[in-house]
Swiss-Prot record:
InterPro entries: Herpes_TK, P-loop_NTPase. It catalyses: thymidine + ATP = dTMP + ADP + H(+). GO terms for molecular function: ATP binding; thymidine kinase activity. Coiled coil: none annotated. Its EC number is 2.7.1.21. It comes from the Viruses. Keywords: ATP-binding, DNA synthesis, Early protein, Kinase, Nucleotide-binding, Transferase. This is Thymidine kinase. Substrate binds at Y51, Q75, R168. HAMAP family: HSV_KITH. Catalyzes the transfer of the gamma-phospho group of ATP to thymidine to generate dTMP in the salvage pathway of pyrimidine synthesis. The dTMP serves as a substrate for DNA polymerase during viral DNA replication. Allows the virus to be reactivated and to grow in non-proliferative cells lacking a high concentration of phosphorylated nucleic acid precursors. Belongs to the herpesviridae thymidine kinase family. One of its GO terms (biological process) is TMP biosynthetic process.
Amino acid sequence: MRILRIYLDGAYDTGKSTTARVMALGGALYVPEPMAYWRTLFDTDTVAGIYDAQTRKQNGSLSEEDAALVTAHDQAAFATPYLLLHTRLVPLFGPAVEGPPEMTVVFDRHPVAATVCFPLARFIVGDISAAAFVGLAATLPGEPPGGNLVVASLDPDEHLRRLRARARAGEHVDARLLTALRNVYAMLVNTSRYLSSGRRWRDDWGRAPRFDQTTRDCLALNELCRPRDDPELQDTLFGAYKAPELCDRRGRPLEVHAWAMDALVAKLLPLRVSTVDLGPSPRVCAAAVAAQTRGMEVTESAYGDHIRQCVCAFTSEMGV
């Protein structure tokens, strides 16, 4: 069976989940966010907890160090169900093939969201340490052929309006985190383009600026990163590894952090990353994603029924 798998991703509340549900109405198999795992499966609500840690830090009832530890712990919990699902499904996907898909699976986020993108945004705004970011990013799993990741984009004002209108229990609007996330997802797109062009981070390291506190503060306040046709190293995720905490006195990465970037190259290179504007209606957005499928990679699998069973089991337990 020829299978097309699409990961819809991006900063929260862009409309990706609604778009994915519309695609499911057209016959796609939809894998929702594992909201139950985060909010109701255990004694603690991870979504509310990660916001509560920042509130307590701001009002002085929790130290910055303790808040960072709580946030890193909660961020790891966000990643867990994605990693478990990815580990289960990866062996079921075969080599790339030509021809139209016979099954389309639409995932609400790729593991890169919880292991790399959100941790980096949290590092930018000061919610977690550089060490926590590197540790979480190191858990990003490898990607077999056929990974098509579509990053949702949205006008900044409309994005903030949607976020304020959502009002999920335990959440609050964090404009700095939202700005950081928008920058980080632009970095993800640029990373894919940088790697696809054949460039190597070691060749450009010396020309990239430091990812110091001033740079991070700017990324939390201003939308500085945008998808570029020919990005520089500082426009990519690799630029974050030039944080002073991760380098020696001369600005060179410690060897273990160089290994971390090499691993990131190997894991992200197989992903085909594109963008889509989710400003229009959900039906128009779903059609826009569908229009991109002609350029996406399809894989062969002898386990179509098993994939469907796994997705149904995950959805019944983790969806809300």
